[in-house]
Amino acid sequence: MATGAPIRMTTAPRPMTMTMTMTATMTMTTDVLTLSQLLSPSFPVGAFAYSHGLETAISEGRILSAPTLQSWLMDLLEHGGGRSDAVLLNAAFGAADDLVQPLDAHARAFAASAERLRETDLQGAAFCETVETVWGIALGRLCYPVAVGRAAAILALDPELTSAMYLQSFIANLTAAAMRLVPLGQLEGQKTQIALKQHCAAIAKQLQGATLDDLHNSAWMSDITSMRHETQYSRIFRT
């Protein structure tokens, strides 16, 4: 008995699968849009006024070019303020209500200098005030990464995406400061951010579910420049 060519059976995607895929895509898109607003330079936390000690590092000749800036920022992401902020953000995201204030106190105690404490406190206070006014979410007064993590949890945002975009915002703000101080051109600034993009994503992924046990810092030169900035004679940034 002759047999013809095999009959290819095709099945349309199940309606439930399509619905779930569309819902997940829409949720992720909404998360991106919400985080783009929360972490935008236009969000009134005054991020433009803080250099995280970068101003002193530049004035002392430690950062003179795009490559030296990129190296400095990489250290912050892997060993310094960027990483520790991401740890605190994720710890706040997963914290029970009664543990948020102790976590915030720990974050404040972890600040390496008076200016670092001021930087995280004032940005956090402004963030909390704006979130309460716009979204009706009362966060109290929390330092910046704790406030962002807490708001993201309440708004049911994706924690890994929140961490990655927070780190990208952190890098973008310091790059903008360096563009004014070194100075660097706008194209060099954009290339620096692109070079660090994958590191932001990788660190965000690595720190999912992080707790205070994961908190550490070994970017000591950044901490020292932050301390020196307090007595720097001529400066345009608050930290």
Feature-to-residue mapping (PLM):
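Metal- and O2-centered redox machinery and metal/ROS homeostasis
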Residues: 2-239
